[in-house]
């Protein structure tokens, strides 16, 4: 019998990627976050599309158009809050997904890992530009401060900033181009996700043991489709609780004040998911040094496969490395907290210590401990 699922050109691709895909039999719930990220991306594109239908990218009417979405559009408030809190869930899943990759050694699949880093940068750029669009105080000043960092680049910095702004300050030209880029980037992200999956399916998934699972594979459907569905239901529960009970929990009250170039908010800070990088940026007194540290804090992920000294791929049976991994996690929590605090004693000192620890853990301590573990295991 001619099976359409296995022979139709389009269905065949879907079948080989989501139905008959051979998957390791022992992957845990930490492997759910890839599908959850896909769900978050779909949510963001759909809600974003409906928001764009009612949004105006002009500085004189933009704040009113966002208020109009809340007040006058049918279910506009829930669409807007789903989009705003959906971004938070996106980054939560993203950080856990990266953490799982670090813990279980998935970074040894370098193709998939590198596309993942490009995806991370693209998602961060999209989220930053999206935060500017409501044109509240924090939107305006966040855009001013972050784009201004590019002026630290020698020779071309000032010209580059003015080119991005489309003038001599953040204004109408900046808003319209940010809206255009914010609209197009999620589709570029979706294309990159397909490349990410393409590279992943070339090698197959890693598993908690970090060993080859060629001898023990099971079909993706129904086992992992059901498992992913449970994760999806829990994510929906979490998002809906956030949206319906405390939608402004992760936002900034300053963003309910229309953008005013003549009045600076007391504490300019980005959304919570950028605070760790913002804390690293602020911990260096030099502007160019801060920008380099900011970029390095993300780009450091690219050299992790090179720094992998352990003979075992996963951290599952490496207790010393586990201690350092959870120290790194705690350090990121500290950096996130510091990023939201004012620039004063003792927060400056704590931020500097946490920043040094962040780089020291990844560049020095983790490779050293891996070598010690190799010795202990007589490898």
Swiss-Prot record:
GO terms for biological process: mitochondrial electron transport, ubiquinol to cytochrome c. It is found in: Mitochondrion inner membrane. Heme b b566 binds at residues 97, 196. Its main location: mitochondrion. GO terms for cellular component: mitochondrial inner membrane; respiratory chain complex III. A ubiquinone binds at residue 201. Keywords: Electron transport, Heme, Iron, Membrane, Metal-binding, Mitochondrion, Mitochondrion inner membrane, Respiratory chain, Transmembrane, Transmembrane helix, Transport, Ubiquinone. PROSITE patterns: CYTB_CTER, CYTB_NTER. Heme b b562 binds at residues 83, 182. The chain crosses the membrane at residues 33-53, 77-98, 113-133, 178-198, 226-246, 288-308, 320-340, 347-367. It is a multi-pass membrane protein. Its cofactor is heme b. Component of the ubiquinol-cytochrome c reductase complex (complex III or cytochrome b-c1 complex) that is part of the mitochondrial respiratory chain. The b-c1 complex mediates electron transfer from ubiquinol to cytochrome c. Contributes to the generation of a proton gradient across the mitochondrial membrane that is then used for ATP synthesis. Heme 1 (or BL or b562) is low-potential and absorbs at about 562 nm, and heme 2 (or BH or b566) is high-potential and absorbs at about 566 nm. Belongs to the cytochrome b family. The cytochrome bc1 complex contains 11 subunits: 3 respiratory subunits (MT-CYB, CYC1 and UQCRFS1), 2 core proteins (UQCRC1 and UQCRC2) and 6 low-molecular weight proteins (UQCRH/QCR6, UQCRB/QCR7, UQCRQ/QCR8, UQCR10/QCR9, UQCR11/QCR10 and a cleavage product of UQCRFS1). This cytochrome bc1 complex then forms a dimer. This is Cytochrome b. The lineage of its organism: Eukaryota, Metazoa, Chordata, Craniata, Vertebrata. The gene is MT-CYB.
């Amino acid at each position: 019998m001619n099976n359409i699922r296995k022979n139709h050109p389009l269905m065949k691709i879907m079948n080989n990627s989501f139905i008959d895909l051979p998957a390791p039999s022992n992957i845990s719930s930490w492997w759910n976050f890839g599908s959850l990220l896909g769900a978050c991306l779909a949510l963001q594109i759909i809600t974003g599309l409906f928001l764009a239908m009612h949004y105006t990218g002009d500085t004189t009417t933009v704040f009113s158009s966002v208020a109009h979405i809340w007040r006058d559009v049918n279910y506009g408030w829930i669409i807007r809050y789903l989009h705003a809190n959906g971004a938070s869930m996106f980054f939560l899943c993203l950080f856990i997904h990266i953490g799982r990759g670090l813990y279980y050694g998935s970074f040894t699949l370098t193709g998939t890992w590198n596309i993942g880093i490009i995806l991370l940068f693209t998602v961060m750029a999209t989220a930053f530009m999206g935060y500017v669009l409501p044109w509240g105080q924090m939107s305006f000043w966040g855009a001013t401060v972050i784009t201004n960092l590019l002026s630290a680049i020698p020779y071309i910095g000032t010209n580059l900033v003015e080119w991005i702004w489309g003038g001599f300050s953040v204004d109408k030209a900046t808003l319209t181009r940010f809206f255009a880029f914010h609209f197009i980037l999620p589709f570029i992200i979706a294309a990159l996700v397909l490349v990410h999956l393409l590279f992943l399916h070339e090698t197959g998934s890693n598993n908690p043991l970090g060993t080859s699972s060629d001898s023990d594979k099971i079909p993706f459907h129904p086992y992992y489709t059901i498992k992913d569905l449970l994760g999806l239901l829990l994510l929906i529960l979490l998002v809906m609780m956030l949206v319906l009970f405390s939608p402004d929990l992760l936002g900034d009250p300053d963003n309910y004040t229309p953008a005013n170039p003549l009045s600076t908010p007391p504490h300019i800070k980005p959304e919570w998911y950028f605070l760790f990088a913002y804390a690293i940026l602020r911990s260096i007194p030099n502007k160019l040094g801060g920008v380099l540290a900011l970029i390095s804090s993300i780009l450091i992920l690219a050299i992790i496969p090179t720094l992998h000294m352990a003979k075992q791929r996963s951290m599952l049976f490496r207790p010393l490395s586990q201690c350092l991994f959870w120290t790194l996690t705690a350090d990121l929590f500290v950096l996130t907290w510091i990023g939201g605090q004012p620039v004063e004693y003792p927060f400056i000192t704590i931020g500097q210590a946490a920043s040094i620890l962040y780089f020291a853990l990844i560049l020095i301590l983790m490779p050293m401990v891996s070598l010690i573990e190799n010795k202990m295991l007589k490898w």
